Amino acid sequence: IETAAGKVTAPAYIYMGVRPDTVAIALGLGHTAYGRFAQNIGVNAYDLVPAGWDAAGGLALGGLKGKVTITADKSPLVTTEGSARQHGRGIGQALPIGVLLGTEQENDEHHHEIPGLPSQDFKTGLKSPVAADAQGEFANPESKDQGMYDPNHVQKMEKRRWAMTIDLARCTGCSACVTACYSENNIPTVGAPYQGRALSPSQWDERPGANIIKGREMAWIRLERYYEGNDNTENEFSPDFDTRFVPMMCQHCGNAPCEPVCPVYATYHSPDGLNVQVYNRCVGTRYCSNNCPYKVRYFNWFGYGEPERRQYAWPEPMHWSLNPDVTVRGKGVMEKCTFCVQRIRESEHRARAEGREVNADEFTTACAQACPSRAIVFGDAADENWTVSKLAYDRRAYHVFEELNTYTAVVYLKKVNYPAPASPAKA
């Protein structure tokens, strides 16, 4: 794209929200002098704007003539979203504002009734988490052999159910939660180690996006985007469609499908409702990932500290930014969202040292803390004083794949759709 002020070279991504005779490029993005770790990442559309001012004193952005040229450069554009269509699975659900106002009936096309399992049973799953038999001797409070743990403490923990609500009406898809999770939990980036440099044939597998194409992505939160309201599947332009963003992380199921298939008990259920992963037990069978209906467990394909593959290591001084409360995982093990268990335990230890209970909403996860629209709320769903316990029973609440009887700890709130304003021709 070239104007009299300058030119930029950017990849083309076909999106049905942009007219076919239009090119949209964001202002203010791209890094050209941000250090060696972000060198030549993206472009800034301000490079196309001359230093002129309009009558109001602002930068003149209108009236510029530009030229768009197709180059011969090719590079894969990779996303981790998967399908842009829900195919009737009801992952990202919505309802019209009229339903909340009581002026129309809800057409719940994604509601699934299971014989013998009322749809409201998930509330019981939140209030009374399924205690795993990994803590076998604690399952019976009358047991005389309580091991090394205080039985009163264990029973108190079983009354908790750490849970999360995600309001799809507030989520804008900004990915702040994803970035915060990377920073908080020492998650390595599987990206483009040779960005901006020519590749030899031996380095072809290291080209931008190559490892993501192979399914080797690493992110504890996956931001899914779905299109509704238009039947075209070729991403052709359409003025009438609905976009829904769904942050997808480990659902910390009460009946977790990943737990019974692990041959070494690397994943188990904690008394307070967490789906726990023990890294030094894991041998990398990936059975848990195969059995997870939400596909939120990830395998470490690379050794991020191996001296012979330094392109994947944490380069200096970036290793000083690692969170000391979270261990760095090695190649060959599975990992996933932990509900920021380090923050949970730190809060519990502080409360115990001060001789009190954990106060409602006194801490939260990294993703909830970073969310600018407060779409994510975390807390104890079994304690009515926590905000999450109130939101979990909102009339918009639903669970993804509720019919699987997994009793997930993540509750989504349906997006609220407003009627489209009448066009001048129809007004």
Identify the residue ranges that each predicted region occupies.
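C-terminal, active-site-flanking charged/polar segments
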Residues: I1-G57, G284-V296, C367-V377, A381, ...
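Ferredoxin-like iron-sulfur electron-transfer modules
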Residues: G147-G173, T233-P257, P263-Y287, V296-A366
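Flexible loop/turn segments at secondary-structure boundaries
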Residues: K7-T9, V18-D21, H31-A33, T172-G173, ...
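Long, compositionally biased charged/polar accessory segments in the mid-to-C-terminal portions
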Residues: G332-A427
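Carboxylate/His-rich catalytic cores and anion/metal-binding grooves
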Residues: C174-E236, V283-W301
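Short microdomains enriched in Cys/His and/or Lys/Arg
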Residues: L199-R225, R281-N291, Y312-D325, V358-A375, ...
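Long, contiguous, secondary-structure-rich segments that constitute the structural scaffold
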Residues: I1-A163, A169, A180-S183, A192
